[in-house]
């Protein structure tokens, strides 16, 4: 019996050692990028607001807080660090930036829109990679430098950095309807809603809310005429119900796509855009949220 305990103890120790990952060297990441990011539970994210782009959708100004931001997130992995990122690109940026991503040995997992009728047109390119932290930071930095080169300057230092949008919405009323509390930034009231009901992994690494596995909604405008843009994170059996709920409530679905390619379970993302009475839009989002997080045995109402 004693021998069994010893052997079992050794095996457990080896298993823990094999699964152990080191903490991120955030100082090295900051030094390579030249900017300070945000840390969260052992993960780290660099965000670049696209202040050099002046974009409108249906008369509403789209500022970085409405979803116009590039980001690179770092999380510990067995071989050092796994990165995930979302790069905002114009039609002019698209080809040279994707060439740079491939040149750096990173992968492209999605290219898609967030909006329609937006001028100028922008797209979002998701990238990924894993390896030593310093190498991943250098590769991601090279991609961001390519964007700077094409646009002729640092996107974060554009003229839109001081811009705000009109927001006279009753945020407390929205909170009560949606069931979550948002945060205000430059006139944009934004909800970020995680999926704690789903244990998501990419290459056997946990993908958290902070790494982009979330549903979000960004608001601006007035109670009578509000605009809301956002993203739903959905399991495959939730997609049809979420789309149905949004469309039936006057909210336009503008994109359905993936962000990752090796994730388990499979996750789909949906972008939407709504204009109208704020209370009605909030009720529509709540109806769509009710289609997510259901137990496997629950039946989806498609009537």
Predicted regions and their residues:
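N-terminal signal peptide c-region/cleavage motif recognized by signal peptidases
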Residues: 13-18
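Long, contiguous binding/interaction regions
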Residues: 19-121, 128-267, 273-303
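Positively charged n-region of N-terminal signal peptides that target proteins for export
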Residues: 1-4
């Amino acid at each position: 019996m004693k021998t069994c305990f010893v052997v079992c103890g050794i095996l457990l120790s080896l298993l823990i050692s094999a699964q152990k990952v080191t903490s991120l060297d955030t100082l090295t990441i900051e030094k390579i990028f030249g900017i300070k990011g945000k840390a969260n539970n052992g993960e780290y994210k660099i965000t670049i607001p696209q202040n050099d782009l002046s974009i409108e959708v249906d008369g509403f100004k789209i500022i970085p807080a409405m979803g116009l931001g590039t980001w690179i997130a770092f999380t510990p992995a067995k071989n050092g660090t796994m990165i995930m990122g979302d790069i905002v690109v114009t039609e002019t940026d698209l080809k040279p930036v994707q060439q740079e991503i491939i040149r750096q040995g990173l992968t492209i997992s999605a290219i898609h829109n967030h909006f329609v009728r937006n001028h100028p047109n922008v797209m979002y390119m998701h990238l990924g990679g894993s390896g030593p932290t310093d190498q991943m930071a250098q590769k991601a930095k090279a991609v961001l430098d390519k964007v700077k080169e094409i646009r002729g300057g640092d996107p974060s230092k554009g003229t839109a950095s001081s811009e705000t949008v009109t927001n006279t919405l009753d945020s407390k009323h929205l909170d009560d309807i949606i069931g979550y509390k948002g945060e205000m930034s430059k006139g944009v009231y934004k909800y970020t809603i995680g999926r704690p009901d789903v244990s998501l992994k990419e290459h056997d690494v946990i993908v958290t809310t902070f790494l982009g596995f979330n549903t979000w909604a960004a608001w601006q405008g007035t109670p009578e005429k509000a605009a809301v843009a956002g993203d739903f994170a959905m399991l495959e059996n939730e997609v049809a119900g979420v789309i149905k709920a949004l469309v039936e409530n006057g909210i336009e679905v503008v994109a359905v796509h993936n962000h990752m390619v090796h994730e388990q379970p499979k996750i789909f993302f949906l972008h939407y855009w709504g204009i109208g009475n704020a209370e009605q839009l909030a009720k529509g989002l709540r109806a769509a949220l009710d289609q997510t997080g259901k137990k496997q045995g629950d039946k989806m109402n498609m009537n």
